[in-house]
Curated annotation (Swiss-Prot):
GO terms for biological process: reductive pentose-phosphate cycle. This is Ribulose bisphosphate carboxylase small subunit. Residues 109-129 are annotated as: Disordered. It comes from the Bacteria. The basic functional RuBisCO is composed of a large chain homodimer in a 'head-to-tail' conformation. In form I RuBisCO this homodimer is arranged in a barrel-like tetramer with the small subunits forming a tetrameric 'cap' on each end of the 'barrel'. The lineage of its organism: Bacteria, Pseudomonadati, Pseudomonadota, Alphaproteobacteria, Hyphomicrobiales.
Length: 129
């Protein structure tokens, strides 16, 4: 099952040229770029591992692409995403996030439902590889 999280998630995977163009757009807006990775694609897993520190002072996308390539070499079977962070006063938030690397075989999610006291229902997601 293809994981659909972030911008461009319903499109085919971006090429490195397309990723570079998106990174350059973000840098042109003055946004910092961060690289993150995980092996757990669960929708509630919002805390991915950071690859180094966010890059606040870059002007050229080449620096981000070099870090992305290093992360891909170290974690070829993990999900890798780029986050653009707007540090403007009052915003201070992630403004763009998109997946740039996926494992060859993506896991699927299965939902199980159980009844509890008072007919309340509990849901659980399981990752199946």
């Amino acid at each position: 099952m293809r994981i659909t999280q972030g911008c461009f998630s319903f499109l085919p995977d971006l090429t490195d040229e397309q990723i570079t163009a998106q990174v350059q757009y973000c840098l042109g807006k003055g946004w910092a770029i961060g690289v993150e990775y995980t092996d757990d694609p669960h929708p509630r897993n919002t805390y991915w591992e950071m690859w180094g520190n966010p890059m606040f002072d870059l002007k050229d996308a080449k620096g981000v692409m070099m870090e992305l390539e290093d992360c891909r070499k170290a974690h070829p079977q993990d999900y890798i995403r780029l986050n653009a962070f707007d540090s403007s006063r009052g915003l201070e938030t992630v403004t763009m996030s998109f997946i740039v690397n996926r494992p060859e075989n993506e896991p699927s999610l299965r939902m199980t439902r159980t009844e509890s006291n008072g007919r309340s229902q509990h849901y659980m997601w399981e990752t199946q590889r």
